[in-house]
Amino acid sequence: MKKATPELLEGYLKIMEAANKSNDGNRCMIAPSPELKKRLKDDLKKIKKQFGASVFSNILKPMGKTKVGLNDALLRPGNSFPLGMSASRVKSIAADRLPLQGTVRVIVVLVDFSDKQFSNTKKQYQDLFFSEGMLPTGSVKEYYKEVTNGLVDIAGEIVGPYRMPRTLAAYAHGESGTGDAAPNARTMAQDAAKAANSAVDFSLYDNDHDGYVDAFVVIHAGKGGEETGQGSDIWSHKWVLPGVYNADGTHVYAYLTVPEDCKLGVCAHELGHLLFGFPDLYDTDYTSEGIGDWCLMAGGSWNNGGLTPAHPCGWCKAQQNWVNTVTVSANKKGVAIPDVKDSKTIYRLWKDGGSGNEYFLAENRTKKNFDKFLPGEGLLIYHIDDAIDSNSNEMHYKVAVVQADGKKQLEGGANRGDAGDVWPGASKKLTFSNTTKPNSKSYGNIKTDVGIKKIKSTAGIITADLFVKAGPALAIVKSKLRKVKK
């Protein structure tokens, strides 16, 4: 067993410092691979035993109030917004622009370095991003076609590889490319834009005609820091250039970068930031698991080793109108809830059907298509608080999975999801209400009267009684409403 040496401590803290850059500025980084996460946990145990937990006091705690760009999809420089606009409003505008639908064009630039050359062909990336029926586990195009219910068609081109003016070691800068000091990964992305300018008409990639390229992707030679944990390898992320790069009557600013052996899940996750404004829904300070393997924007980007990423969660889909969100305004009996991939429907529940930042969402997820490698299948219930920026505080997530077994293993970091999270699931839980464990009370411990009862799964279809008021459910029989005892 590896000894907890000072060198191990230094290496661990460097990885955590690089990873925590997603809590600062405009960086949104991919979650570490399961293998790296396990290694970090093992190292953490050894270091705590040898040096004591106090060495982590400034590293592993939530970062508190952060700058604009934390886990959001800031796509334009701050000075492009009206003077005096609040940071939270800027974040909201960046993430809540009109959904991109129809053909969405993506430019992919390949780059290598004098100390690390490209070993793959351009066709491999053409297939990974834009092919149909070519890859056994699917392409970016096929992934977004499925999860958006056909509303988004990813298209574009691959150019390069271009030799960068600096080495990989220089851009990584010992900090996985995410350090503040130049050169870093954003310097690399700017150099990539300059190198590709003569071959690319960047105006074709401003899909919503707001004056900014929507998806500028840089694929670099070498491995990703999210898998190796090495400061000499660039950690996949979404960030912004050091300054706006003007080309072809438009602006290049936001970008994402992934390594040459990039997995579909990494690409789809980072495009979730860049194109659709999704925040990271894993815990970016790594003290918990966020919503784990249930969502592309959390650990689900790594399902099947990153080859078969999970669908975005129902909350993400609702932000982009990829699903029909049914607001439950009256108690209903015997509601049939098919797999969201078939029904394209999720359910919103709160006291009396009220609006506001806090509420519950429910969707049915089964193990098929890109959801094939989910940790379980059944009814997923989420506790949402849109007033919260991220999933960094395990006591109060922005988007939380209400785990049916009540063990809160996602918050505790015990796993990235299991069959006990869903309803009825492995724990065979049939009722969710004010009085069950887990319960439907608000974060302020106030009864909401939300209930999902008599939960049953038959051939992949969930049926349940839905409650948002104290009192009986209503059933529709021969076009007449009759009261039904709870």
Task: Put a short name on every predicted segment.
Residues 135-139, 324-325, 387-391:
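Short, surface-exposed, polar/charged, turn-prone segments marking secondary-structure boundaries
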Residues 177-180, 258-259, 318-325, 415, ...:
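A broad, low-specificity signal for short, low-complexity segments enriched in glycine/proline
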Residues 479-486:
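Viral virion structural and adsorption modules
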